[in-house]
Amino acid sequence: MPDVTRRVAIKRILSASVLAVPFSGVSGCGKSPAEDEVSAPEREEMAAVATAFMRKFDVPGLSVAIARNGRVVYENPFGESNRESAERLTVSNLFRIASVTKPITATSIFALIERGKLGQHDKVFGDGGVLGTRFGTVPYEKWVEEITIDQLLTHTCGGWDNSNDDPMFENPGMGHAQLITWTLDTKALKNPPGMHYAYSNFGYCVLGRVIEQISGRPYRDFAQEEILGRCGVRDMRIAGNTLEERLPEEVIYYGQNGENPYDMNVTRMDSHGGWLAAPRDLVLFLNHVDGFKSTPNILKPDTIKAMTTPGPVNSSYARGWAVNNAPNWWHNGSFPGTTTIMVRTASGFCWAALANTRKPGQPDIGLALDNMVWDMVRKVSAWHA
């Protein structure tokens, strides 16, 4: 997907939840507090906002989950998971989440840091690095051996950005090891590490291999067992690449303007863009890393603070999370057939919204998806959003 729409992805990330409403999510037990209840007229107004978004961007299926103070207070699927068969979307349908994966990978890294198995400023490549000389040809190109874990987390490794030659969208037949070796050998860094922000999918691919090296487990297993499972998430999976590899609960993706959702190696994107999820899954995850006391967090407060503190070069991006002064934390995702966002806000809300299409160009569907959920939340007067 090396097109101009990917180059604006980070603009979406940095501006998307400047508008975001407050949410935090996990399903609670017992009766919801009265202020959490959504009336029938309010639900109708929320649905009107969602369907207007769908009409504007020709969205087949849209699914939204919202939580407040540790309790899921709203879930609604709109439209179809499969246009051809007119199969209605359900709350359990799984979507590719694209770069909404990155907070999950960052949380996995910080879990290892918290356990003393990894250092935030450890070197990644070369003698003494976490990955040593496992990938690439020694001697490495200039600056490669200076890259640290933190620089990968903050997109300041010095190159390999998501421009027209993003390594993650080249050589689709290569596995992780081949692709990392090829990239180290053929794509020189553009800047010294730590000096320049450039959004890097490849950097998060490398972080997935760091997790595997330290934990001794495949990335997906570590994330499922040590992160998602501890949040009560059971159904998230790494996506396949083709329509034939579609899982039973997975939606069908629809490209627009000539985009093909099924010609990418999404499985290889595991740690930067490869997960499948339903909105509730993401809300459950958010609720357990949001730093609030309404639900137990899976990381210590100091660890969460380190993960969500703005980076040294770009004050709008922390470590796997876009951030602002509210402080709200969020991430969005975008590739052919997929538009996604999840948000944690300072006032105790979390949300996730997932769509099974992407419409390139302007107006920006990613920003519109963010605005849509804000508008939906503001329809509930008791939430004071």
Where are these regions (language model features)?
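Short, well-ordered beta-strand elements
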Residues: 339-361
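Active-site SXXK
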Residues: 64, 70, 93-124, 207-212, ...
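Short, gly/Ser/Thr-rich active-site loops of penicillin-recognizing serine hydrolases
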Residues: 308, 360-385
